[in-house]
């Protein structure tokens, strides 16, 4: 997998992407796709088309778009995914009324991202987890009954 880092001004095309940067503006990338999925825990529709997504880990509860499990990686139906390797907030504009592609930006003058390809969406995820690390199997107790205090406080109710 090739890692691309860009700083500077102007526009540079590579593969299906175009990079944009103007003095004083966030660095942006725009990629062609038909369906985008991912970006970690979100309380919005699974298919991200038409959404503006801000990834920043915060505990906002289930009634907001804020989450504390943001993952700056999305996958498309065109057999590629994009990982934005930035510790700060990342803003995604996903085929909304403002853009016809996926566009993402970060504050500052440096954008560090990786385009992860594969023969299928499954293969893209395999390549991504090779890069980021494979998840461990959770302990058996996590597959049992869970109680939540998000929606009820009466634990004497029958379940």
Where are these regions (language model features)?
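Catalytic and substrate-binding clefts that recognize carbohydrates or anionic sugar/phosphate headgroups
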Residues: 1-140, 148-150
């Amino acid at each position: 997998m090739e890692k691309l880092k860009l700083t500077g001004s102007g526009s540079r095309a590579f593969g299906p992407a175009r990079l944009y940067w103007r003095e004083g503006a966030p660095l942006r990338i725009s990629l062609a796709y038909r369906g985008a999925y991912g970006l970690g825990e979100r309380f919005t529709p699974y298919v991200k088309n038409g959404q503006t997504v801000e990834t920043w880990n915060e505990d906002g509860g289930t009634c907001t778009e804020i989450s504390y499990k943001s993952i700056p990686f999305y996958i498309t139906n065109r057999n590629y995914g994009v990982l934005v390797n930035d510790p700060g907030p990342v803003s995604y504009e996903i085929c909304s009324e403002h853009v016809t592609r996926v566009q993402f930006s970060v504050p500052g003058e440096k954008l560090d991202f990786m385009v992860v390809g594969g023969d299928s969406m499954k293969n893209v995820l395999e390549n991504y987890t090779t890069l980021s690390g494979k998840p461990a199997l959770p302990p058996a107790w996590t597959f049992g009954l869970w109680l939540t205090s998000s929606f009820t406080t009466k634990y004497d109710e029958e379940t």
